[in-house]
Amino acid sequence: PSGMSFNTWMCPADTGDGEAMSLRAGAELANIEFLRMTVVPRSFNAAGLNALSGMGAVLINAKGEAFMDRYHPLGMKGPRYKMVQGVLNEMREGRGPVYMDCRGIAPEAQKHLIATLSCDKDSFKDYFEQLGIDLTTTPMEVDTSEGMQGGPNEVCGSGVKINKDCGTNVPGLYAGGNGADQCRSLHMAVTSGIHAGRMAAHYCASL
């Protein structure tokens, strides 16, 4: 990894304070041992390469070799963690730096890609312009993110252990969103936040 503590796609303020406070209050935590990593543009602390790889970009090492077939039978279509493994291994074995190469993407697809780069990452296009990177002619250097809070699968996260009412083993303490062990992803964060708030209000009204 880069050694930069905030080299993740998570908000820099997301430092686990909620889980820590809950633990000190006596709440149980679950799945904390799971971490996740991803491949990120060098010095741009946000994920954003799925669009590139999904349209045909490939990871290459400093020798210009496309290497993902060495790490998974599906190559670039393999699981994200295999991409991380591949990038780390290439760098550790002296074949870095590693690049995302978009030169093989069809011209029309390249235009679409560049036009939509900033849809969910406002400064992504600025990043390329300021570094003078033309994705149609120049491979982009990538790195691996730091380890982030993860979970055993894409649905189940890690954090404060909750029940169906978003309650914990501490009476009156409720949790939702990324701080809870069952609420990974945006829709789960929204619905669990609403439900946890309602259940907390019911608890207060019963006192």
Predicted regions, residues:
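Short FAD-binding loop at a beta-strand-to-alpha-helix junction that anchors the flavin cofactor
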Residues: 1-3, 165-185, 192
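Generic recognition of stable, solvent-exposed alpha-helical segments in well-folded globular domains
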Residues: 14-17, 119-126, 155, 168, ...
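FAD/FMN-dependent oxidoreductases across multiple families
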Residues: 127-169
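Glycine-rich loop(s) and the adjacent beta-strand/alpha-helix scaffold that form part
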Residues: 1-46, 190-199
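Short, small/polar residue-rich loop motifs at catalytic or cofactor-binding pockets
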Residues: 52-54, 154-156, 182-183
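An anion/pyrophosphate-binding glycine-rich loop and adjacent beta-alpha core
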Residues: 27-142, 199, 203-205
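Hydrophobic alpha-helical segments, especially N-terminal targeting/anchoring helices
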Residues: 60, 162-163, 189
